Amino acid sequence: MIKRIDHVAVAVRNLDEAIKSFETLFDLKPSKIEEIPDQGVKAALIPIGDTEIEFIQPIRPDTGVAKFLESKGEGIHHIAIEVDDTDAELKRLEEKGAKLIDKQGRSGLAGKIGFVHPKSVHGVLLELAQKV
């Protein structure tokens, strides 16, 4: 079941600068900063009300985020929706004909995550996130 928007992810070239900007301009501080080697990113979550902004910086040039920055520059990368069960939701969406990037959930900064291909959601990269 879909619960709420969990976070909006913004691809950045320099995570420290992005964090500093939000601290200076909005007095917002990250609740979590983590390197996620299997995804090739370093990320920070900044709480805003009951949702978060996630800054993601590539740590390798061969990642999807690095390619995104190369082609589109900094900006919104994906929207994450909180779900009760990532695997069940991915299966349900696939049965309805959605094209998936992940067939099963995997570990991510927002919990157990899985991505739906933008071709299935009108150009939006959609992340499903289950709190664990």
What is the meaning of each model-derived region?
Residues 17, 35-39:
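Short glycine/proline-centered loop/turn elements that form peptide/ligand docking sites
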Residues 27-35, 97-104:
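Short secondary-structure junctions
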Residues 31-32, 62-67:
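A short, acidic/glycine-rich surface segment
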Residues 44-47, 54, 81, 90-132:
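Vicinal oxygen chelate
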Residues 69-95:
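Short, solvent-exposed interaction modules
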Residues 16-29, 93-96:
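Amphipathic alpha-helical segments
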Residues 1-17, 74-83, 132:
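N-terminal beta-strand motif that seeds the catalytic metal site of vicinal oxygen chelate
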